[in-house]
Structure formats: C-alpha cells, structure tokens
C-alpha cells in the first residue's frame, strides 16, 4: 500500500512539474531548474543573458527537442535582431510541435519584422481556429 501511495505522489508531482511552464505543448518534458529564472530574464528584457542560459540548456540532449525552450531561445534571438537564427529555432520548435501557439505567434511576428507579410498572414491563418491570445496578439502585430 505504501508503494502505491508513493508512486501516485510521484506521478502527481511529474504532471504538476510538466505543465508548470504554462505551455500548450503536448511534448512537454520537465524543465531544468534554471529555466524559470531564464523566463524571468526574458520578461525583464534581458535577452543576451537569457540567450546564454538557454544555450547552456540546449547543450543537453534531452532539451534539444523541447518546443518551449526552443521558442524562448528563438524569441530572445529575435529581440536581439538575430532574425536568421531566430527563424531557424522557431522552425525547430514547430517541427517538434506544429501547433505550438507561442512559436506560431512569434514566427509570425518575425515575418512582420522582416517585411514578409504574406508569411505572417499565412501563420495567422494557422492560429485562426484557436481564437486564442496568440491569434489576437499576432493579428494586432500585423495590423500595427
């Protein structure tokens, strides 16, 4: 009986940790302990520091396919105007999770930033049916 309770508690902890990042990703893995601090750096617009931290995380094989980490890395790159590398990493995130709303929104914003409105609008169309925050934000970004 003790083993069952312990196993159930471990399962609940895993599920709770898996979704702590607020992702819509179905390919979620438990994030490294440094990840929440890196997200805070991004929210504080400290993109260079975030890039350094995310690069350390991405050196570990188990995180190279995490769409949330890839998206945050691409976002930070885009904010430092490294558009080519940012696009590469958004596409990596989307190859893992084609419906990742954050990656879709942000790659759409990258297309606007790089004057490719046709691609931005095509990306917006992919978000159209979700009627989610990402759709509204990308639509607003396109219409600025």
Task: Label every model-predicted segment.
Residues 72, 106, 138-141:
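Canonical tetratricopeptide repeat
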Residues 105-134:
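TPR/TPR-like (Sel1-like) alpha-helical repeat modules
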Residues 43-44, 79, 113-114, 130, ...:
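Register position in tetratricopeptide repeats
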Residues 64-66, 100, 132-135:
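Residue-level recognition of tetratricopeptide repeat
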